[in-house]
Amino acid sequence: MPVDFNGRAVDIKNISELANQHNLSLIEDAAHGLGCFYGKKHVGTMCDIGIFSFSTPKIISTGQGGMIVTNNKKLYEKCKALKDFGRKPDAKRNMRMAFEHPTIGYNFKFTEFQAAVGIAQMRKLRKRMITKKKMFRIYKELLSKLSSVNFIKTDLDRVTPW
């Protein structure tokens, strides 16, 4: 599980090659990477599954919860069942299936309120990214005058500092 941390993308190339050699799936932990890029791709979209956190200290918050992204229909169906007590995704429309739980699952559903907050927050993502980058530049300018302070190399076209 590669982890994007503090607004910086993990170097996914070698990890992906190793996973492919051993026929392994990868889950990218992009909890700290929303809005960041690896090359020209958004972090969280480079593996079989990408996960994002919307907990309180993140760039977008719904209080708690998060988001899973995938372009694999089978994994999508599995995630959908896991978040709804193990029910099949179409179980709510079929009363006979509504009480069947073919797999172990959990209650990981967002409330409508959390979803509304998340949508409103997403609309502010670009502005927040710009603000974070401005703050980084200010801190770097002021703190770089101190000989005891060093900065990690940061490409602001790829990184959104937290």
Please give the residue ranges for each predicted region.
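Active-site phosphate-binding strand-loop segment of PLP-dependent enzymes
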Residues: 1-62, 67-74
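PLP-dependent aminotransferase class I/II
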Residues: 1-3, 8-14, 21, 37, ...
